[in-house]
């Protein structure tokens, strides 16, 4: 059986990167929440 996690940095960045977050209203809300919380890293990518 094929494993479900097939890592790819391109897919990772496109889905979870900073520019992906900035592209949608809800993504910007995610960043705003993380800024308000004082996160050192806004995105994991």
From Swiss-Prot:
Molecular function, one GO term: structural constituent of ribosome
Gene Ontology cellular-component terms listed: ribonucleoprotein complex; ribosome
Transmembrane segments: none
This protein's record includes keyword Iron: no
Family: Belongs to the bacterial ribosomal protein bL34 family.
Family matches, as HAMAP family: Ribosomal_bL34
Entry-linked PANTHER family: LARGE RIBOSOMAL SUBUNIT PROTEIN BL34M (PTHR14503:SF4), MITOCHONDRIAL RIBOSOMAL PROTEIN 34 FAMILY MEMBER (PTHR14503)
Entry protein name: Large ribosomal subunit protein bL34
Organism per entry: Cellvibrio japonicus (strain Ueda107) (Pseudomonas fluorescens subsp. cellulosa)
UniProt gene name: rpmH
